[in-house]
Amino acid sequence: MAGWHLDTKMAQDIVARTMRIIDTNINVMDARGRIIGSGDRERIGELHEGALLVLSQGRVVDIDDAVARHLHGVRQGINLPLRLEGEIVGVIGLTGEPENLRKYGELVCMTAEMMLEQSRLMHLLAQDSRLREELVMNLIQAEENTPALTEWAQRLGIDLNQPRVVAIVEVDSGQLGVDSAMAELQQLQNALTTPERNNLVAIVSLTEMVVLKPALNSFGRWDAEDHRKRVEQLITRMKEYGQLRFRVSLGNYFTGPGSIARSYRTAKTTMVVGKQRMPESRCYFYQDLMLPVLLDSLRGDWQANELARPLARLKTMDNNGLLRRTLAAWFRHNVQPLATSKALFIHRNTLEYRLNRISELTGLDLGNFDDRLLLYVALQLDEER
């Protein structure tokens, strides 16, 4: 029962519940004999010597008027030990004639012990949930599964050898108060942690949740399309009964040491890139954004600056962005002149003129594959797209 104890809230709940069973005052004492719950609020905090007798002798103690006069903080009544898993965790006392109360004592005690057991189980469930969340937070940072992580997982009944892929749920909690946002997050967490899903979920903050999903299907294969459908179904389902607006990004599936950490990084970057490129969308997938996600790690480094140089030259002479939009459309339509000109509502000669102008300004030959690739990569890195 490590971490659990009979506290004042639990004691007062027991008093409220049991006083509905029997019309007499009820006291609840902790394992030190102090009154921590009572129908007579003035008695809370007093040391109850009758409870000390119960705690020391481990049995029911009747207190009549004669005995009560010789004990501190005691009135006539019956005092029973409260046991949890065979251990005495407190005492419950009923005030009144012992002879009249004896037949109710066991019933009241049984009710109190059932409440204690329920409280302990809730505590264990909450503790288990916190430990699982901490494990998830460690796994998304770990480059390998250390013996300590493996032992931690085993104690929680989690198999770290099960392949997993990471999804990130980013929540817009700005429209809700803190309490409401947390309640909605916990509702979402509960929906994601049902046993049949076998997900590991951690609430990182009021705006982010991490989900470690089993990666392989029933045939032992990675099926990105199946995961896509599941994410889309989740978003549809949560729209029906939740107030939260949220986005989901799904990272890539990796194998080997540090696979979960790598999957988390791809999910994180997929979210960032997805919001930049498709702000109206609610779900983003690594497979759809693979190149810009992989290139994002270069951002800020000298390699990215070199790759961006041709496009930077184009920008200086393309104030209204017309040539860049033309270039992006050309690549989007697989460098096919007819499809590109139709999409832009321009004549093919106009398209050819613009492409020639782009070649002049960038110093690159758009008929050369390597030069095309340089410009395409530069566009992928361009934050002004």
Swiss-Prot record:
Tell me which family the UniProt entry assigns to this protein.
Answer: Belongs to the CdaR family.
Q: Which PANTHER family match?
A: CARBOHYDRATE DIACID REGULATOR
**Database matches in Gene3D superfamilies:** PucR C-terminal helix-turn-helix domain
The UniProt function text for this chain reads: Seems to regulate the expression of the operons for the enzymes involved in D-galactarate, D-glucarate and D-glycerate utilization.
A Gene Ontology molecular function term for this protein is: DNA-binding transcription factor activity
Official protein name in the record: Carbohydrate diacid regulator
- Taxonomic superkingdom: Bacteria
Q: Entry's InterPro entries?
A: CdaR-like_regulators, CdaR_GGDEF, Diacid_rec, PucR_C-HTH_dom, PucR_C-HTH_sf
Keywords (alphabetical) are: Transcription, Transcription regulation
Supply the NCBIfam families for this chain.
PRK11477.1
Pfam families according to UniProt: Diacid_rec (PF05651), GGDEF_2 (PF17853), HTH_30 (PF13556)
An example GO BP is: positive regulation of DNA-templated transcription
Organism listed in the record: Escherichia coli (strain K12)
Nucleotide-binding among the record's keywords? no
